[in-house]
Amino acid sequence: MALLLATVPAFSADSVAPSPLTREPVGGVSLAEWTARWWRWADSQGVAPYLDPDGRLCDLGQDGPVWNLAGTNGRFQPRRECVVPAGKFLLLPVINMIHFQVDTPVSCEELQARAAVNNDYLASAVVLLDGQPLGDMRRHRVKSDGCFRIDADDAHSRLAAADGYWVMLKPLAPGRHTLSVGANYGVPDGGAYSRMQQSFEYVLHVGTRTQVVSRGQGPTQAAAP
């Protein structure tokens, strides 16, 4: 699959069709909180969802009104095929960062600053739904509300801050849909993940299990980010 990289498109206010995106709370939960929950979801699974090579991990840990999609560790370009129950909102990470406290205590403000650094330099971001661009991704930067514990039930778990570009899609009509993502940072001074790229595609079958391409057994071994 070719890497989807392009200049960030200009936002058009003249769209005649209703936007498939929302920034309104879903289930009484803000978009920022949903992104924190996404990181908890990704951290708590036996296999990292962002290492999914082809969609075999789509159902992993899914619960509630929002269905989590996954990006990658920036080292491969998957095409994933999934069945999604009808009526689910879809949370899609475009490109993002998270920083944790590890061994040395770090203030929440410092974690937030570290999570923000690459996201201040978005070089390119394109998201296509069924071949149609979803607008200017610079408008979809989401920061966590302060910092959060990576385990919501453990007050002593790692403190984290997240920052990046996300979209929340309204429930899609039943049937087959494609989501294509291409994004990259361009931090002038370099540094960790400063040239990170995302390039991945989902084929989503909403509300049906027909026509899903058969996949191999078990996840492939891919390097952690």
PLM region spans:
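N-terminal segment immediately downstream of the Sec signal-peptide cleavage site
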Residues: 13-63
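N-terminal signal peptide c-region/cleavage motif recognized by signal peptidases
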Residues: 7-13
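Bacterial N-terminal signal peptides
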Residues: 1-7
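Extended, well-structured beta-strand/loop surface patches
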Residues: 122-174, 182-210
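Extracellular-facing segments of soluble proteins and assemblies that are Gly/Ser/Thr-biased and enriched
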Residues: 66-148
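Extended, polar beta-sheet/loop recognition surfaces of beta-rich domains
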Residues: 87, 98, 110-119, 131, ...
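A short tyrosine-centered beta-strand micro-motif
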Residues: 92, 177-179
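A glycine-anchored, Pro-Gly-centered beta-turn/N-cap motif
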Residues: 88, 173-176
